[in-house]
Amino acid sequence: MKHIILGNGPAGVVAAETLRRAATGDDILLVGNEDAPPYSRMAIPYLLEGNIDERGTYLRKADDHFAKLRIRQRRGRAVAVDTGKRTILFDDGHFEPYDRLLVATGSHPVRPPIPGIDLPQVQTCWTLDDARAIAALAKPGSRVLQLGAGFIGCIIMEALIKRGVQLTVVEMGDRMVPRMMTPEAGSMIKRWVEKQGVRVVTKAGVERIENGEKSPLTVILS
């Protein structure tokens, strides 16, 4: 039997390893759409802090881990699935047949419909490529605006603080981490963050982003 797993994040990797234990003779193909080996997105802030290198984000450290388990790997993006014929079409035109298919592709960042959101200096923080781009832009002393001060936002914020940037954080809610913290707790976090030199703006959003005259970008708040 042939198993294909679309997505080589933690869920896909554990699924492939579990399948191998349960079906020692089956064909298992693990598919990811990035050049890097399977890695943990949750480790990216620690990469930005400099606590680990890129290899430290990898889910399995041994280079031959998947080969020893006879789990094949492929880089590509599935563009169509024919459940009748049980085939997958990849973006390079290649078809791959399967007996069982697991879709473990996870989620992706939502870019709010803000004019200028697609300018080159505007980054999400989701992939290793994102981390490389942020590291190239977020040099000590550079001015950075972070949109969002939720749980994940605060983890990324800490990494940016350690990079020595001049950081402004904009949060639409009335406090930091609004979905998890009470007003009192949110205020405590804000005071601590401001002591680290971060400017925090709550009850505000971004109206538009423009190319700046004296800096690469100008951000207009609403």
Question: What is the role of each PLM region?
Answer:
Residues 3-4, 59-145, 218-222:
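FAD-binding core/adjacent interface of flavoenzyme oxidoreductases
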Residues 36, 96, 109-110, 130, ...:
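Surface-exposed, flexible loop/turn segments at secondary-structure boundaries
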Residues 1-72, 158-184:
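Beta1-alpha1 glycine-rich phosphate/pyrophosphate-binding loop at the start
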Residues 12, 41, 45, 111, ...:
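A general structural signal for well-ordered alpha-helical segments in protein cores
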Residues 151-159:
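Mid-domain beta-loop-alpha active-site segment that forms a flexible
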Residues 7-11, 126-127, 147-152:
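Glycine-rich Rossmann-fold phosphate-binding loop(s) that bind the pyrophosphate
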Residues 25-27, 73-89, 96, 163-222:
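A Rossmann-like FAD-binding core segment of flavoenzymes
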